[in-house]
């Protein structure tokens, strides 16, 4: 296996066509086809399948291309630094469910390292996309939660994708609302008291199974339910409609502001919030620093305990 073959495979996966990839690589199509066939025979894996839509990656091919991109990018870093004498920025990317504390931890980590020598990316997104981003190497780390309801299904998916989940903290469930809500001053709230107020839930797109919901008690039959795509819209709905959502109780006023509060839900439900990463791939210095920043929020989790 050569670096050239890896570059060829990556180009084919991005072009979706042997003919187009050959043009981009400035080689003949038969030569490219032979190089890909030799690579597949050497590693014993079928990387591509032909279809009416062109060349498609197989599941094994998707995983291989993810690793191939890492190898090629590392080579390019070495080449730029030691051959071309360029100063190359180190990269770090994280994907997460909609957690303000995870975003704020990212902010604090970036402040430590600065932007001159590093290139950062943060993706606050849907549950399945968090998993997919880590699987495909788009992000080094994913932040999400497990509980008794979704643990078996998601853990099985993690295993299929060669991913590992590590718990950071475990906490009870809280009702998040604005401070002007009629129930905001209560010490605890039960589900019956919330019946007349709209429950706000993050939209999960085509992966809208209960197991991918970002909120616990996803199978509960709410009388009023509103789906939203982003946190800003959800906060506006809390104020405008006295809406609420269920959360971890980790308050982060730095980003959401001081107009909101979390009240304990009368429930035995627990959330296990942690990080997802690729099995066998070491976490980078930037990744570890980010996790260190998240760990600082353990003490801010209402009623939580550290794992």
Task: Go through each PLM region and give its residues.
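Hydrophobic hinge/microswitch elements
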Residues: 135-140, 145, 204-261
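Flexible hinge/capping segments at coil-to-helix
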Residues: 157-199
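Alpha-helical linker/hinge and terminal dimerization helices associated
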Residues: 42, 64-86
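Central regulatory/effector-binding core of bacterial HTH transcription factors
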Residues: 89-152
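Secondary-structure junction motif
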Residues: 102-108, 147, 151, 190-191, ...
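Beta-alpha-beta core module
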Residues: 160-166, 171, 232-281
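Short helix-boundary/capping micro-motifs
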Residues: 10-28
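A short LG(V/I)-centered, amphipathic sequence patch enriched
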Residues: 40-57
């Amino acid at each position: 296996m050569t670096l050239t073959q890896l570059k060829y495979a990556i180009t084919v996966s991005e072009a979706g066509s042997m003919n187009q990839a050959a043009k981009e690589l400035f080689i003949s199509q038969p030569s490219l086809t032979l190089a890909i066939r030799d690579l597949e025979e050497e590693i014993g894996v079928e990387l591509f399948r032909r279809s009416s839509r062109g060349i498609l990656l197989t599941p094994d091919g998707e995983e291989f291309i993810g690793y191939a991109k890492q190898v090629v990018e590392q080579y390019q870093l070495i080449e730029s630094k030691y051959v071309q004498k360029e100063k190359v920025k180190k990269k770090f990317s994280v994907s997460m469910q909609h957690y303000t504390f995870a975003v704020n931890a990212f902010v604090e980590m970036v402040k430590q390292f600065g932007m001159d020598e590093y290139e950062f990316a943060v993706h606050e997104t849907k549950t399945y996309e968090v998993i997919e981003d880590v699987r495909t190497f788009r992000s080094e780390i994913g932040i999400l939660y497990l509980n008794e309801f979704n643990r078996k299904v998601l853990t099985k998916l993690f295993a299929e994708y060669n991913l590992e989940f590590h718990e950071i903290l475990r906490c009870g469930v809280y009702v998040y609302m604005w401070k002007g809500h009629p129930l905001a001053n209560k010490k605890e709230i039960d589900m019956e008291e919330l019946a007349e107020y709209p429950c706000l839930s993050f939209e999960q797109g085509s992966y809208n199974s209960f197991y991918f919901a970002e909120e616990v008690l996803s199978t509960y039959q709410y009388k009023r339910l509103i789906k939203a795509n982003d946190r800003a819209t959800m906060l506006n709905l809390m104020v405008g409609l006295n809406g609420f959502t269920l959360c971890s109780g980790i308050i982060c006023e730095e980003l959401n502001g001081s107009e909101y509060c979390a009240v304990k839900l009368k429930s035995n439900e627990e959330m296990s919030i942690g990080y997802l990463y690729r099995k066998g791939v070491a976490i980078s210095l930037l990744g570890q620093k980010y996790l260190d920043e998240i760990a600082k929020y353990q003490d801010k989790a209402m009623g939580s305990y550290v794992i």
